[in-house]
């Protein structure tokens, strides 16, 4: 996979993600399922979900790879998108793997992620990470990503 574009800012993360989903030909009720770490990935998942809120898809959050714990992602007035009630079903047309899954010390293995992806052979696979996490963890070659959004949060400036 080669880098095609270099964008910046939050819109540089969200616009290509939304464009990809629009081009994927998803219909009403098709699921975009985000797999990520509770707490750290969740805010980014809700931000991605907000960017695509006008598409006719269902959005689902799966903590780590525990599909039995899947939660729906729904709009909340004057807030944005929020992880909410149990999802009821997990049947992704698009799997979104968050980079937190590839970080050292996370209680999920690459093999467990590979198994959940393999359980949905018809699903497209998108990766969203920061600071080249998929490349550093060797996931770029291990997963058949259709799109990777790799953003940088560097430098971080603190003003006091």
Give, region by region, the residue ranges found by the protein language model:
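Short glycine-rich or small-residue beta-strand-to-loop segments that form or flank ligand, phosphate
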Residues: 30-38, 62-63, 94-101, 126-127
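Long, charge-dense
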Residues: 44-104
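Glycine-rich, aromatic-bearing surface loops/beta-hairpins
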Residues: 85-90, 94, 98-160
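Short, charged/polar "capping" segments at the starts of alpha-helices
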Residues: 41-42, 69-70, 132-137
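Secondary-structure boundary elements
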Residues: 23-28, 55, 118-122
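Short N-terminal or domain-adjacent regulatory/targeting segments
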Residues: 1-29
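N-terminal interaction modules that seed assembly of large macromolecular complexes
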Residues: 28-53
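Short, glycine-rich nucleotide/cofactor-binding loops
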Residues: 6-13, 36-41, 101-104
């Amino acid at each position: 996979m080669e880098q095609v574009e270099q964008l910046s800012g939050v819109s540089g993360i969200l616009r290509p993600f939304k464009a990809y989903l629009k081009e994927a030909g998803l219909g009403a009720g098709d699921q975009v399922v985000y797999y990520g770490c509770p707490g750290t990935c969740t805010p980014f998942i809700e931000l991605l979900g907000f960017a695509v809120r006008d598409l006719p898809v269902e959005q689902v959050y799966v903590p780590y790879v525990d599909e039995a714990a899947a939660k729906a992602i729904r709009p909340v007035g004057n807030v944005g998108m929020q992880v909410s009630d149990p999802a009821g079903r997990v049947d992704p047309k698009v799997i979104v793997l968050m980079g937190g899954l590839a970080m050292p010390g996370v209680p999920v293995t690459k093999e467990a992620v590979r198994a959940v992806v393999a359980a949905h052979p018809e699903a497209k696979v998108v990766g969203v990470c920061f600071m080249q996490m998929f490349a550093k963890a060797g996931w770029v070659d291990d997963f058949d990503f259709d799109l990777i959004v790799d953003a940088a949060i560097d430098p971080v400036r603190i003003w006091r």
